[in-house]
């Protein structure tokens, strides 16, 4: 996994609360088990006016020219609620998002995001309100999300966020569960050598 230390990116404001996983990636697109190819179906029922996904909805935020290429999604409370599907962070990352900022996240989505190198940043509702206003008033504004410092820098101000130290360590060092295990490979090998022959 790639290391996540700091990210600078264009911000897209999704001004809706309780965005569930079925809105993020509708169930009809869940047949695949690989992590790629889901970005084209991200927010499918909102991004497109037809079932085939060929007629863009000109009013949806991700279709607006000013937000093309956004890598930071600004959202409202309880983002990622609904059914447990890892496809939701897969779709967001495949579309190009690196960070989601919101006042709160559904627990399962929150964990799945970290497992897929998508950083969920929790800020207060007041701070998120300020950031929405900032994005709407300043076309092309970029945020600096610094995981080492645990800050979001925008509009000349810094907004601090909390994060579990273990998850922070994993993202900064680009470690998934396999990478974490390999960090202790020498200890595992030493333990195995101490075992009786028939257990090796």
From Swiss-Prot:
InterPro entries according to UniProt: 3-IsopropMal_deHydase_ssu, Aconitase/3IPM_dehydase_swvl, AconitaseA/IPMdHydase_ssu_swvl, IPMI_Swivel, LeuD
Pathway: Amino-acid biosynthesis; L-leucine biosynthesis; L-leucine from 3-methyl-2-oxobutanoate: step 2/4
GO cellular component: 3-isopropylmalate dehydratase complex
Any single biological process term in GO: L-leucine biosynthetic process
Claim: Kinase is one of the keywords in the record: no
Keyword Glycoprotein: no
Broadest EC class assigned to this enzyme: lyase
Reactions listed under catalytic activity: (2R,3S)-3-isopropylmalate = (2S)-2-isopropylmalate
Keywords in alphabetical order: Amino-acid biosynthesis, Branched-chain amino acid biosynthesis, Leucine biosynthesis, Lyase
Listed SUPFAM superfamilies: LeuD/IlvD-like (SSF52016)
GO molecular function: 3-isopropylmalate dehydratase activity
EC number(s) per entry: 4.2.1.33
Stated role: Catalyzes the isomerization between 2-isopropylmalate and 3-isopropylmalate, via the formation of 2-isopropylmaleate.
PANTHER family membership: 3-ISOPROPYLMALATE DEHYDRATASE SMALL SUBUNIT, 3-ISOPROPYLMALATE DEHYDRATASE SMALL SUBUNIT 2-RELATED-RELATED
Subunit structure: Heterodimer of LeuC and LeuD.
Family, as annotated: Belongs to the LeuD family. LeuD type 1 subfamily.
Protein name: 3-isopropylmalate dehydratase small subunit
Organism this protein belongs to: Yersinia pseudotuberculosis serotype O:1b (strain IP 31758)
